Amino acid sequence: MPKAFSKNKLETDMQVYDYALNLLTFRDYSASDMLLKLERKGAEKLFAEKAVAKLKEYDFINEKRYAQRVYEAWLSKKYYGRQHLEAELHKKHVLEEYIPLIMESFTEEEEAARAELACQQFLQKNARKLNQVDQKLQAAGVRFMAARGFSGRQAYIILDKLRECNAD
């Protein structure tokens, strides 16, 4: 970060706006995250709100675009399901009005494919235990899927795979 922003408190509305622009060169922020970041840096609430309003006016902060970018970043995580996506959207302070839109774009087929990948990962990690499939391993498989945000329906994929391995 430039030295002008490193230790100095933000005392004018222009300094606050410049600092906010500087932050946006690194990544997107939601309006609430930007306000919080500016206030933590020492900006007065009024200056921070003015800066965020100006950034919104010039479309530097766009909540819909931010929601889409959070979703795109989440898609790179291959082993997670629908519930994890929803939790991630809330954690990143995506506006409530955009969460259903993002959730709609994540299809059942995509979730099933991700569940399959997660199942393969679990089977690889537990390859030496597969010859003795028991309730403990099945429970571990279901916990593995649940921890990654998959529903019970998706967790059955791993149980079926474990039964297949036991039948072989």
Predicted regions and their residues:
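An alpha-helical, amphipathic repeat domain used for nucleic-acid recognition
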Residues: M1-D168
